[in-house]
């Protein structure tokens, strides 16, 4: 009997370790759970979706069924039935999409309730484009071919040249990096250099498909040379103290709020959103001399099903009403001659 209980406990611990990307979680601790099988004690609002249905402009929602941690599809928004505009948006401003859509629909009421948008990382959105707009999440597979795609300006230019996107590339705002930490900053992280310290657990964007990783690498090298970048993205990945995220704008704050990581580099806007949402998150500023700037841009996808709608959104995205929404989260309007990407 004791052997079977021990095996069950080990299996439970192994599962918890696997789902958290190699970071050991307190949930596997029999002392914390009083040696009993219990439902998690997590606060429901720690888990996405964090907008409580606001990032969905569907007019008829039918039966509501959202279960944080289990059934939520937090990066897929709107009604897939018959959209009049499909947007693939690099997820760095998922939180700004609801007010942007509301303003767009106010200006263009014919589109009310007819937008569908996705906010997974830009590299993964390209994979979806290459798959004909088809994606599978959990047990569900659907197809939503994009009308417009949004990412860093350099990537947009690259895909315009390759023929995937139609010219012109439309830049609209810029963003800078910050270090996101739990509200009480228990690891006392004060700078990028601190991220190389042994024992500091990091949640970092994956260079394979998250464009922010390029800017982070540049910032780390400015702060501590190649040695710091290697420590964060090579040495600490190898020893398990850096976990690479799949969707940094969802996972980094989630890991921090659960105590699974001590810090992670994100866009400043993402930390501001978490703070405005009242989550137990704060940030550590990165000096301008060490920081990197991203230029956000978009373009119509070649062969878009709704080219008129795509052009309307691309015109709207750098209008004054749209820029005012972006500025709530620390974005700055793009000005010609700005450097970044």
Whereabouts are the PLM-identified features?
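Exported/periplasmic ABC-transporter solute-binding proteins
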Residues: 27-114, 123-127, 139-145, 154, ...
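Surface-exposed patches in mature extracellular/periplasmic domains of secreted proteins
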Residues: 113-116, 167-169
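Bacterial Sec-dependent signal peptides at the C-terminal "C-region" and cleavage site
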Residues: 19-28
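N-terminal post-signal-peptidase region of extra-cytosolic proteins
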Residues: 130-138, 159-165
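Phosphate-/polyanion-interacting regions in eukaryotic proteins
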Residues: 117-118, 149-150
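Bacterial N-terminal signal peptides
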Residues: 11-20
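Conserved SGNH/GDSL esterase-like catalytic core that processes O-acyl groups on lipids
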Residues: 119-135
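Bacterial N-terminal signal peptides that target proteins for export
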Residues: 2-12
